[in-house]
Amino acid sequence: MATFSIRRYSRQGLWSLFLTCAFPLHFWTLILVFRDISWLTERTNAWDAIGVASYGMIFAFAESVVVFLVTALLGFLTPKQWEPERRIAFLGLLILITSVWGMIAQLLFLWNIFLPAQAIQFLRSSSHPLRIIYAACLVVVTPTVLLPIYAFIRSNKAIMFMQNLMERLSLLTMFYLFFDLLGLIIVITRNIG
């Protein structure tokens, strides 16, 4: 079993994959924290706002671990002949694409962007509104997923680009992990005191 997983992944590759999984979750958590910190401070005080931010960072770390484990397991579905570096870059690409769509979905909710009234009326009058919604989502999402994957599979430049991007994001993510540690210390301090 150990030799099987070593052929699929290297230790450095798994660390790089974890950092890639952690980056979008921490980035988005920090954006939401900075968005909400002012009204939290006004509502309570700065120490409570820092506590809420700390819980957010700890939760982002826990999410990162879960996403990493699922992604690493999905890596076993990739072609066996791929080198570990290529597999890690491919999985990183999938994580980043999925994360961008997750952020877009949450932004639409946060900005209160809904379907226009005409579209809602059309969906009400149709016999299968969910099918229409799913088809529309499929038309929008599919190219944004398949085109980068196709470019990745066909082009060595895309593979190199993804590997370089993951390497650059790794340094920033290490900084985010430091914030996780600070958040854990703050949460422990707040709960003890």
Language-model segments: which ranges?
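N-terminal membrane topogenic signal
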Residues: 3-21, 164-171
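Membrane-proximal helix-loop-helix units in multi-pass membrane proteins
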Residues: 81-142
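Alpha-helical transmembrane segments of multi-pass membrane proteins
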Residues: 22-39, 184-186
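Membrane-interface interhelical loops and short amphipathic "cap" helices
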Residues: 37-56, 112-129, 187-193
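Membrane-interface helix-boundary motifs at transmembrane edges
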Residues: 7-10, 78-89, 156-166
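Hydrophobic cores of alpha-helical transmembrane segments in multi-pass inner/ER membrane proteins
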Residues: 24, 59-75, 134-152
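Final/C-terminal transmembrane alpha-helix of multipass membrane proteins
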Residues: 165-191
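Hydrophobic alpha-helical membrane-insertion segments
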Residues: 17-28, 91-106, 177-178
